[in-house]
């Protein structure tokens, strides 16, 4: 027996002695007697989404929403025209993921008017409408004329 084999044999003997002292542990299967079934835990893989599901994070990361893509097209229905005449409010289709502050700043920059408030409405067809109420010093009819609605 050379020195390497001797050290291997000693290590093997020590491990065997350790196991003999500790005892071999056999886990007995527990018998469940309850009526409720607990679904076994399965492997949960780490998620790697293609894009963020939160609106603000998505818009900040991509940064593709400029003023022209936030405010899309004006609405020229009778209801929208009545709002324009009576309440000094313009109605526009806007980007689905845009927020009220984004709509307000984009509208002010595009048309050089002051906006008092913005109300939004998600339609059944999947579009988003913005009811943009102009400030008292701005007139919606003048703006509509300038855009070419009237």
From Swiss-Prot:
GO terms for cellular component: ribonucleoprotein complex; ribosome. InterPro entries: Nucleotide-bd_a/b_plait_sf, Ribosomal_uL23-like, Ribosomal_uL23/eL15/eS24_sf, Ribosomal_uL23_CS, Ribosomal_uL23_N. Keywords: Ribonucleoprotein, Ribosomal protein, RNA-binding, rRNA-binding. One of its GO terms (biological process) is translation. GO terms for molecular function: rRNA binding; structural constituent of ribosome. Signal peptide: none annotated. The keyword Ribosomal protein applies. Residues 1-24 are annotated as: Disordered. Pfam families: Ribosomal_L23 (PF00276), Ribosomal_L23eN (PF03939). Residues 7-18 have a biased composition (Low complexity). Belongs to the universal ribosomal protein uL23 family. This is Large ribosomal subunit protein uL23.
């Amino acid at each position: 027996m050379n020195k390497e084999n001797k050290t291997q044999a000693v290590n093997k003997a020590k491990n065997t002695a350790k196991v003999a002292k500790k005892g071999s542990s056999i886990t007995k299967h527990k018998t469940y007697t309850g009526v409720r079934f607990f679904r076994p835990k399965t492997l949960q893989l780490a998620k790697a989404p293609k894009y963020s599901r939160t609106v603000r994070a998505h818009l900040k990361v991509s940064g593709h929403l400029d003023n022209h893509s936030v405010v899309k097209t004006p609405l020229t229905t009778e209801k929208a025209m009545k709002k324009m005449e009576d309440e000094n409010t313009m109605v526009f289709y806007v980007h689905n993921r845009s927020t009220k502050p984004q709509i307000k700043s984009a509208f002010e920059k595009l048309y050089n008017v002051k906006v008092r408030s913005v109300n939004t409405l998600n339609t059944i067809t999947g579009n988003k409408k913005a009811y943009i109420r102009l400030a008292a010093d701005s007139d919606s009819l003048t703006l509509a004329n300038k855009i070419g609605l009237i």
